[in-house]
Amino acid sequence: MATTPLLLLLLTAVFLSTEITAQRAAPAPGPAGPINITAILEKGGQFVTLIRLLNTTQIGNQINIQINSSSEGMTVLAPTDNAFQNLKPGTLNKLSPDDQVKLILYHVSPKFYTLEDLLSVSNPVRTQASGRDVGGVYGLNFTGQGNQVNVSTGVVETRLSTSLRQERPLAVYVVDMVLLPEEMFGERKISPMAPPPKSKSPDVSDDSESSKKAAAPSESEKSGSGEMNTGLGLGLGLVVLCLKFLL
């Protein structure tokens, strides 16, 4: 009977030592790796075109650097491949490299927003494209209620369908349309290549023609002067004849 408590003590000691050893052997969780926007989009599985544009414009690297160094965070609105396919043919190819950069930056806000934040945010919301053009706002307008949030550019309007990530410092929301800024695609936008409207000026050739017509005597004037000359000649002839008879 005396050996039973001793046996229990030994088993308890063995159990405790095993627990301590296991705790020491368990590796401590390492720090989380840097956030990568491309990796997040690749995991989403329907953003091939957007990833390509992020790489060719180098905006993907800029986002990664700013996300991991800024305290404000960022919000990305990610158009799907279908969204790009629904654009008019040649829309992207017609854009200059600088305009392509502005188009992608227009989908990025330099601040972290939850869906709840976007429902009460002051419009227009600044984007990374804001301030790149003189007088260009490049802002986004958010409206909605409940869990539905809509975004409008002045040219297109769509809703934020799903969230790929909504954790500081980065929020990524899926949109079903490419966000076209009014500064680039609005109806009132004048193409920089369009010639300026010509001011209507008097035609020099018309003036010269009219002056020639004014200077040239009309047919009636010509006939009138001819008749006058004929009358004067007859009168002088009669005077000469009368003088001859008198003399």
UniProtKB/Swiss-Prot annotation:
Glycans are attached at N36, N55, N68, N141, N150. Residues 1-25 form the signal peptide. GO terms for cellular component: Golgi apparatus; plant-type cell wall; plasma membrane; plasmodesma; plastid; side of membrane. A lipid is attached at G224 (GPI-anchor amidated glycine). Residues 34-179 form the FAS1 domain. The keyword Transport does not apply. Keywords: Cell membrane, Glycoprotein, GPI-anchor, Lipoprotein, Membrane, Proteoglycan, Signal. Its main location: membrane. It is a lipid-anchor; GPI-anchor. It holds the Pfam family Fasciclin. The keyword Signal applies. SUPFAM superfamilies: FAS1 domain. Residues 225-247 form a propeptide. This is Fasciclin-like arabinogalactan protein 13. The lineage of its organism: Eukaryota, Viridiplantae, Streptophyta, Embryophyta, Tracheophyta.
